[in-house]
Amino acid sequence: MRRPWRVAVVGGGIAGLAAAVRLRDSAPAGTEITVYEQSGVLGGKLRTGELAGQPVEFGAESFLMRDPTGAESAAVALARRLGLAEKIVHPTVGQAALVIDGGLRPIPGGTLVGVPGDLERVATVARPAADADTDGGRPLVGPDADISVGELVRSRFGDEVVERLVDPMLGGVYAGRADDLSLVTTMPALARTARVEHTLVGAVRAAQAAAPRAPGAPVFGTLAGGLSTLVEAAVTASGATIRRDAAVRELTATDTGWRLTVGPTRDPELVDVDAVVLAVPARPAARLLSGPAPAVAAGVGALDYASVALVTMALPQPRLPELSGFLVPSTEGLLIKAATFFTTKWGHLGRPDGLALVRASVGRYGEEAHLQRPDADLAATVHRELSAVLGTPLPAPVDGHVQRWGGALPQYAPGHADRLGAARTALRAAHPTLVLAGAGFDGVGIPVCVRSGETAAEEIITALGGSAR
């Protein structure tokens, strides 16, 4: 292929933008990259807004500094590539709490997403089942099996550990329940060790040992000035043509690549390209795949999503505990499932006037009806519940914002990784220049999405480099 490549990236979230940057870095000079975003805003779930005159995250708040192997995460590497490494800041308060019986108790250490590696350390919040985690003479999970996190943990530690520890931890990330979420997709490190170890305590410890972290090394980071700076820098570095408010409605295979149908039904724009990175959620991806790859579309489109709302308040001089925030088990009967004390957790957000920024997350999978309330009602309920948990009336907010994220968080059922692997294998065989990327396929979190986009870009480069066209 001698002429400049033309590559379309459908979806302007961080996965799509990471793909565009990698294409610019690694594809031949002159490659034409166009990013199509159906909304008017780039960055997907990365969105920095302003509250009481201060930048605040209305979407994703931070990223992991390390990947599961202990190496630098893809988010950190991207920030470094974009010249933002010096802007990375870390939490100044790391201790979080759980709401247990209406009060706050510190989250015990030594767990892996709430799954304990030391049963004595979690006794302050949950009572593990006595003598259930015994060596049965074989690995916990079969070599090719995938089960729910809840099934594994309940069988070894009992209900209370799941309901008070694991469920709220997973709920804070996925807005889902441990009994419904895939072990392989949501906790891959534990899944690997569970295929070798005979006890769950042993599997947790082995997973922790496989990704050692230096004492005191930060787990999370964010960018001073907000995560939208990552989005803006990626757009600039990609050198891509950015098409906002440009919905791609159809993909059609051609003799030389792909034809995109873009824009309104009555007057569509037809665009011919050599390759496509499809970096949109599973259901929109399935709609676009329904023509060229209907069997793949059927598998991809089965993924369900949870909706959430983030309620952020600016509170004048509230009495807050010295915590980064707290998680709420569903058994507590509260609307909120998590809260973050932004100005306590992140020292760079602290204000001399004592104004505090507090954000609460609302919404669990299957409970979308709770999100039908008007913004004012949602904010009032959050304010009331925060006051009750903290044991003191909070002052009235001087500013606030409700950000609703409909269908935001994928619910990876057991077997997701195998289903996705089969779909990708079929798609690669039939259409190597059409590649999937994003949270709906590879997992949530900024590093995973960045890596997903970069991997998709590399697949496109390989496919076009080997093309005879």
Tell where the protein language model's regions lie, with residue ranges.
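Conserved flavin/dinucleotide-binding core of flavoenzymes
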Residues: R2, T48-G49, I107-P116, L323, ...
